[in-house]
Amino acid sequence: MASAGVYRLWPQYRQSADVYLELVLQPLIWMDLLWMGLLPGLSEELLFRGVMLPAIGLNWTGVIFSSLCFGVLHLSGLQQWPYVVWATVVGLAFGGSALMTGNLLVPVVAHIITNLLSSLIWKVRHG
């Protein structure tokens, strides 16, 4: 999992991710993590890859622009710029998968799995 590698190797990202995930995950109980995987994974992909990408253009320019917007959505403070960079890169992967497969199910499933795994791992480590 690329996120785990980036988390270990980039201290600024690790700090930024911990702040963001603590803000979002700390108050949740374990069963809530299921919803944290499903709802943002589905709704964000429908918005950014299902609506925005076709509106901009089903091409790499559209993928780049929608991914930048996706990254900015994850900004929770100016010190959180590393998390925005990471979300933008992930958005490029999700957008590229939608563009190359012509199927929204691929990025939706990838996003849900990413959210579930990262939420579970963070919750285990930070309780």
Task: Mark where each language-model region is.
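Membrane-interface interhelical connector segments
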Residues: L9-Q26
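Transmembrane helix-loop-helix hairpins at the membrane interface
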Residues: E22-G127
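Hydrophobic core of alpha-helical transmembrane segments in multi-pass integral membrane proteins
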Residues: M1-R8
